[in-house]
Amino acid sequence: MKRSLLIGVAAFALLAGTAGLAGTAGAADLKFKPGEDSRFNWASLEEFKKGHDLKGQTLTIFGPWRGEDEALFKSVYAYFVEATGVELKYSSSENYEQQIVIDTQAGSPPDVAILPQPGLIADLAAKGLLTPLGDETKQWLLDNYAAGQSWVDLSTYNGKDGTSALYAFPYKIDVKSLVWYVPENFEDAGYEVPKTMEELKALTEKIAEDGEKPWCIGLGSGGATGWPATDWVEDLMLRTQPAETYDKWVKNEIPFTDAAVTGALEEFGWFARNDAFVDGGAAAVASTDFRDSPKGLFSSPPKCYLHHQASFIPSFFPEGKVVGEDADFFYMPPYESKKELGNPVLGAGTLAMITKDTPAARAFIEFLKTPIAHEVWMAQTSFLTPYKSVNVDVYGNPPLKKQGEILLNATTFRFDGSDLMPGKIGAGAFWTGMVDFVGGKSSADVAAGVQKAWDSIK
């Protein structure tokens, strides 16, 4: 799926570790000394410490983070170890999706698993391999996460008996609803950052009228060619339809041929299928590699002024380009005419769940409810949170803070739709359908083809 694909290229996961790495932490590993930096909510750590004595116990956690991200996660759980006295062992695997299935079904699960695939979590819950986190945690998410109902919805699955319950805790989020630009180019041309989709469209037309190309769009990605267009469609779907319609779409409760879906395709086509709007013309969209696509922002003169992509894309900016200085981004705006849809955010992220019900596992979920469990990672890199009680000034750099504020201002959050669909669709027919669409095939024909593929796996 797309999430797995991007783990290998994201700035948030540049370094790979060795399969089966295990990590322990103690007080000597604390990145920031408790009480010394007033930006951090040390009181939340002290309060947590009072009620959790786990000396003599061991907590095992299995997750997707390796290399640099593993070291960052270790810097967080070091505070859990210091507060509780528990021995904590973290491990991962290059094929972590398969490994967690093997371990849980074999009866040798970790105490806590952290995964970025809601579909896989749903499978584990349906097999009775997860422990419900309870109504208290559900209420906590509603009260403490911005767009709280969205996070409850994302974390709720059907158990083995078919009863729905909260099985997961969202922790470490990625934002996809971003449009990238070069401030100097905007300043030179007299352009302003749009606040609505109508303004974004007007800016697109203005740039074209000025004889320039507004957008750089590239769908090329080897065997995964087409996936960047699915993010476009998902973002536009959330800005033209209620979130409930989006939810029905990703579950195939409404077909791809529904007007809500083809309408989002057409909105993407407004940008991508107009030769005047895209560097290289519409014919170049499918063949341009997504990694090369943003480079046009930095050409002199610019080959384009706008680029839609998730938070990882600076990994592929030309060497030496600094986000916040040489490049910046803005939230992909909502439609003025659709104010009732609020400020939707498309993204991805990881969710923690209890795969072996132990006091230490339950304590770890409680630890994730403390601001300090978020702020320690925020202060470094590669971490965003919708937790309303954190101090956003802790973020390690202004771009991270800006993305964090986008999450906090969201009225709705939805997970990447193609990652919620069956692999044959979300990492297959949807991708190839988008290539056909930018190549000139009608939205109706593309939608019919994807739906036919979905019907074949029922």
From Swiss-Prot:
Part of the binding-protein-dependent transport system for alpha-glucosides such as sucrose, maltose and trehalose. It comes from Rhizobium meliloti (strain 1021) (Ensifer meliloti). The gene is aglE. Residues 1-27 form the signal peptide. Belongs to the bacterial solute-binding protein 1 family. Keywords: Periplasm, Signal, Sugar transport, Transport. The lineage of its organism: Bacteria, Pseudomonadati, Pseudomonadota, Alphaproteobacteria, Hyphomicrobiales. InterPro entries: Bact_solute-bd_prot1, SBP. This is Alpha-glucosides-binding periplasmic protein AglE. GO terms for cellular component: periplasmic space.
